[in-house]
Amino acid sequence: MSFSLKDEHHRFVCYISAGGKKEAFPTVTEAINQAPTSTLFYFKAFKAAHENPKELLGMSLGHGNSSLSIKDIYYSCTIGENELLALDIYIKKYNGDAEETLQKIYFILDKVIGEYDTATCIGEITLHKLQSKKGLYPLVELANELKGEMTRQTISL
């Protein structure tokens, strides 16, 4: 669970997270449906995406032995298995520590596209050291990619 500052109605927002685990989504949804109503706070399911992901470009995520600057992360993607996005993530100072770096990437993805979309729209993630930015996009633009993909899927149906 996490809290945010007061919203436009002067209520605190309490986010109930599934920890990125799809199997916990029904539990989160049920908790939200049973949550009390209040004039002081309200509950929302899943960690929300930042309203303006480009504002994240000035931030870094420090954890473990290193820090990861969001402005140094780029991506390319394809539609992979099960119609999920397969992301190739390119990091300026990638040190090869996939486990620690993936933890940070998932945390950042939760901020860029939200916990729900991270868990339901992203399939595999492959990490690379950034050699060139040619053909790549800043990770903060992934939300636009998802919106475009959802629009393309809707139109094609």
Regions inferred by a protein language model and the residue ranges of each:
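Aromatic- and glycine-enriched beta-alpha-beta binding-site module
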Residues: S2-P53
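Long, disordered, Ser/Thr/Pro-rich
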Residues: E8, G58-L61, L142-A143
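Histidine (H) residue identity feature
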Residues: H9-H10, H50, H63, Y116, ...
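Surface-exposed beta-strand edges and their flanking turn/coil or helix-capping segments
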Residues: T29-A31, L56-M59, E100-Q103
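Short, low-complexity, polar/charged sequence segments that are solvent-exposed and flexible
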Residues: Q34-T37, G62-N65, F107-L109
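Aromatic/basic-lined ligand-recognition segments
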Residues: L40-N95
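Long, hydrophobic alpha/beta structural blocks
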Residues: T78-S156
